[in-house]
Amino acid sequence: MRVALYPGTFDPITLGHVDIIRRAAALVDKLVIGVAINRDKGPLFTLEERVAMIEAECAALSAETGTEIVAHPFENLLIDCARDVGAQIIVRGLRAVADFEYEFQMVGMNRALDDSVETVFLMADARRQAIASKLVKEIARLGGDVSKFVPPRVNDALKERLGRA
């Protein structure tokens, strides 16, 4: 069974993330969405809320692709999380050259820790390259419309959280 891990903070999940999930799911038998617990980032949504948003989006994707897709919170090293969930592959999305430089370093470190886990990069769809959770939150905080960047449920959650419902 081919198992892949797609890690991120997903605060919140965006249409860019959903696109990568859809495409990654087509490549494996099981896709684990690793929801990082990163206290340094000070997330807008709790871990439970982020997991619930991911699960809501992935239910339809799982049915569409025939791939098992599950959310899995983690707080340890990425490579340890990959081992914990039985993943042979780590999936990363790339939007721009700046993403590549960071990811290149991460691949090197992960390989040094465990060279049996492969990293696969999926380029962001051209329509989604500018989307970043950080920017989505900033636009939403300032009263902008983020409905083009996030799933409808997430848009509603942002409005509610930021008092714009």
Swiss-Prot record:
Swiss-Prot/TrEMBL keywords: ATP-binding, Coenzyme A biosynthesis, Cytoplasm, Magnesium, Nucleotide-binding, Nucleotidyltransferase, Transferase
HAMAP family cross-referenced by the UniProt entry: PPAT_bact
Domain of life: Bacteria
Organism: Ruegeria pomeroyi (strain ATCC 700808 / DSM 15171 / DSS-3)
Protein name: Phosphopantetheine adenylyltransferase
Source taxonomy: Bacteria, Pseudomonadati, Pseudomonadota, Alphaproteobacteria, Rhodobacterales
Residues binding ATP, per UniProt: T9, F10, H17, G93, L94, R95, E103, R128, Q129, A130, I131, A132, S133, K134
Single Gene Ontology BP annotation: coenzyme A biosynthetic process
Gene: coaD
Keyword Transferase: yes
